């Protein structure tokens, strides 16, 4: 039997999953990742915790599967994107906590860049809007605010990376400083047309090029693990940011195919093939996972692959807020039964703009609201409104995506594949299909983020001949079909847009 090991380093936990070559889960392990909130709007992780929890789960998963490193053909890595790590090349120690993708401390710098008129140039080169969400301004903050960091960076003593780079550095004993194209494309420093770091952007943000990792295709040779870590060396053959990895794991390989991941946030991606498309509807363009040619893996010229993306900052996190903030539930699993205890939200609308609103609105100053309260409102109505807010935000993304697809000469999205922890909530998935008016399809294996990393590693190591073999492995577990009329769905979305305007104080 051939096995693949996927390391899935997320915002709230580190996980490792052993897959067989059919994409079935053989074993898995998970550890929570401590969250650090130094100030309002700031979110950090300790890079040492990231590494400690990730390597521990890898060992646990291998032990649970009762296999050794010699049984694993290759290892794949997928990770929370944009989260920024800066460390000392000699000691391997971080110079500061990692600044997490949710962190908003760099917003003043972003506002300054927008006021200076740089956004059109940045969007054309990177596919991204100027936002504190991305790595570039987080890295600039570290260089400016950590004592001695800029001088050390300019002397070549420091290394920058997103979480994948940090893990590869640790896994290889500091021998390899590298990232993949999908993670690089989320930094706001990477030119997606030239497939390289952009010198003009580096100069604009005062970031020394010598800080940056080498960039490779997502399915290519990233080195091998230090033999002492897992009892033997394992080739690292696949790396992708979590959302591009989920797109790959959902077998969305052709233009027009779309997926939505329901996690801490929600992340919708639509494959656009080899064409770079600039959104006119508030979405981002990002590099999809790229596959190196079989010859000279890691150094060939893969065919470009792009995706349109929309990100919801607060998705499943709204359920955590119900539990930890309002104490309305004692565990996240209770939310479906509580929401199902009422037939609808009773007119309550929740906009969970706790850290502003992401795509397609891009309202960093928006704040969370609950409207439509009456004397008859119960906590069940609020719970249902919280769940529905996840679907409303995702529906706004898909509608924007379909408009962009039609403008580019394509067709609207006709089916949405779903994954992530919250996709097991049948109430949420049915309401999502009702709002969208298209089938929402849940796969047999919902761990598609980790599966995508395993598939990438399998491609580079020869387990799979190509993406056609992966498409043949994909299976649906359930299709949710719309039950609302188009007119009723439009009424619901109109109420949502009104609530968004209130939250944004428009």
Swiss-Prot record:
Belongs to the FGGY kinase family. GO terms for molecular function: ATP binding; glycerol kinase activity. One of its GO terms (biological process) is glycerol-3-phosphate metabolic process. The lineage of its organism: Bacteria, Pseudomonadati, Pseudomonadota, Betaproteobacteria, Burkholderiales. The keyword Cytoplasm does not apply. The gene is glpK. Inhibited by fructose 1,6-bisphosphate (FBP). SUPFAM superfamilies: Actin-like ATPase domain. This is Glycerol kinase. InterPro entries: ATPase_NBD (IPR043129), Carb_kinase_FGGY (IPR000577), Carb_kinase_FGGY_CS (IPR018483), FGGY_C (IPR018485), FGGY_N (IPR018484), Glycerol_kin (IPR005999). GO terms for cellular component: cytosol. PANTHER family: GLYCEROL KINASE, SUGAR KINASE. Keywords: ATP-binding, Glycerol metabolism, Kinase, Nucleotide-binding, Transferase. Sn-glycerol 3-phosphate binds at residues 11, 81-82, 133, 242. Its EC number is 2.7.1.30. ATP binds at residues 11-13, 264, 316, 320, 421. Transmembrane segments: none annotated. PROSITE patterns: FGGY_KINASES_1, FGGY_KINASES_2. It catalyses: glycerol + ATP = sn-glycerol 3-phosphate + ADP + H(+).
